[in-house]
Regions:
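Non-catalytic accessory segments flanking P-loop/AAA+ NTPase cores
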Residues: 1-502
Length: 502
């Protein structure tokens, strides 16, 4: 159970394939069912993995330049979960700090003071315009459709009917003066708009200063902790800029919803701070060494991840927080073991595996979209670099089918380790067989075998091998015999498993 017995050639091939770093030296481990190759390989890899370094954590974060292409963020093992918690805490503290700052009396008075200067400028312009209108014999009045220029004759406002009965020469002279005043008024209104834009820019600048003061202390703590990771520092800088550009939405989202029912049903205005969350897809915080992942159900999404969706008002929606990694993500930096029989039932997984190994990149892509069944636009997460030894385990017949029928297979699975169904019946191998029986008893809490029991199992193994000079390596079958013998030993109240029980 703890070492590979009687498979010297397979061990050498396994060691070679695992140690060589060049491209394409992944392994196909062939052998009959029941030879214990899966268990032996996992045990062997787990021992080797302990000597290797723990790989990085991986997160997906919002891409502020293109929301459809989430960015992948690499962090030292254990820091991914910390960043998730720290950003969640930052979001809540940031919202509270902004709310307190923008609802303070000091902010209100300083904003009013800033705006008053611009209102004074506009009033001064309006006074000048009114004076020009008065000098030209007009009054400017505000109506429902805008500003209206009304003529004044002998101190009286003249309406359209009165204007129409004036002599033509007087009407023409009034129209000339009105046109000149209209030009003056258009110029003044352009100045009004310029003042409004200047006021808006000044208020926006002031708001950013207030927001920066409120949240920079929070961000400084994050930068101190994660600043050595360049991508993380850039991400935190992008978060800061996005908050400053979306202050109105962030502050507005904290107000009670206008439609409580829609909010309860998941509708209404989306939370603008959701995109500052961090989605941890690979968490290696609990690893001690490299990962060893045995994927028994190698469906496409289970191996290569997926983007989940949720229903909102009858429509399926998704975002980067719903990206889920697969077993290939979990095994990245270590070892991924796939059974060929199950892989053969999932051709989409096999094709994706080849692309991943050839491109050295992990891409999360919907299988339906890849095959053209779905035309709607979906997320395209940034690929993650893939550095992993892939070990396919299964019948040798599949190996030859793939080797002869798939030109790409031989480029990416260059090492074959074959587990023989028999081994020589040497004294050393018999002793290893006895050690195997002892380990099985210890692991499963079975009774130990005395010498006659061990001898009987060895003889049974030779019968399985159909050769007195050989021993069978079908350890699954041999293990079942020992388990059955243990039942009879317990039934008879025997302390050990004997020849009779076997």
């Amino acid at each position: 159970l703890y070492e590979i017995i009687g498979q010297d050639r397979a061990i050498k091939a396994l060691q070679f394939g695992l140690d060589i770093k060049e491209e394409g030296f992944n392994l196909y481990v062939a052998g009959m069912p029941g030879t214990g190759k899966k268990t032996a390989i996992v045990t062997y890899l787990e021992q080797k993995a302990k000597e290797m370094s723990v790989p990085s954590d991986w997160c997906y974060v919002y891409n502020f330049e293109d929301g459809q292409k989430p960015n992948a963020l690499q962090l030292p093992a254990g820091m991914g979960s910390q960043l998730v918690a720290d950003m969640a805490r930052f979001i809540e503290e940031m919202k509270k700090a902004l709310k307190a700052s923008f609802e303070s009396d000091d902010y209100a008075s300083r904003r009013e003071e800033t705006l008053k200067g611009f209102e004074d400028k506009k009033q001064e312009l309006m006074n000048e315009l009114n004076q020009k209108a008065q000098d030209a014999g007009f009054v400017i009045q505000r109506s429902q459709i805008g500003m209206v220029i009304i003529p004044v004759i002998n101190g009286q406002l003249i309406n359209e009917e009165q204007f129409s009965i004036l002599p033509q020469s007087i009407r023409e002279e009034i129209q000339d003066r009105r046109k000149a005043l209209s030009d003056e008024m258009r110029t003044a209104f352009r100045q009004f708009r310029d003042i409004d834009r200047e006021a808006e820019a000044d208020v926006e600048k002031f708001n950013k200063e207030v927001a920066s003061f409120a949240m920079d202390a929070l961000l400084d703590g994050l930068n101190d902790k994660y600043g050595e990771v360049v991508e993380c520092k850039l991400y935190l800088g992008a978060v800061r800029e996005d908050i400053l550009e979306n202050l109105g939405a962030i502050l507005g989202a904290q107000k009670p919803p206008e439609n409580p029912l829609a909010a309860m049903m998941g509708g209404g205005v989306p939370d603008p701070t959701r995109r500052y969350k961090v989605n941890l897809v690979v968490d290696n915080s609990k690893l001690e060494g490299a990962p060893v992942i045995m994927e028994q159900n190698p469906g496409h999404d289970r191996v290569f991840g997926t983007t989940e969706k949720e229903a909102r008002f009858g429509a399926l929606v998704t975002d980067y927080t719903m990206i889920r990694g697969g077993s290939a993500h979990m095994a990245n930096g270590g070892f991924l073991i796939l059974p060929i029989e199950d892989l053969a039932r999932n051709p989409g997984t096999y094709e994706a595996l080849k692309r991943t190994l050839l491109n050295k990149k992990l891409e999360i892509e919907e299988l339906a979209a890849r095959m053209g069944y779905v035309s709607t636009r979906s997320l395209r997460p940034e690929p993650i670099p893939f550095d992993c030894k892939v070990i396919i385990v299964g019948d040798g017949r599949y190996y030859y089918m793939l080797y002869q029928g798939d030109p790409e297979f031989k480029k990416i699975f260059k090492v074959k380790a074959e587990f023989n169904s028999t081994m020589e019946r040497t004294q050393e191998n018999v002793e290893q067989y006895a050690q195997f029986m002892c380990n099985l008893a210890n692991k499963e809490g079975l009774k130990h075998l005395e010498q006659t029991g061990i001898a009987s199992v060895v003889e049974y193994s030779s019968r399985l091998a159909s050769d007195q000079d050989k021993l069978s390596t079908q350890f699954a079958t041999v293990s079942d015999i020992i388990r059955e013998a243990n039942y009879y030993a317990e039934s008879n109240g025997s302390e050990y498993i004997t020849e009779d029980h076997v």
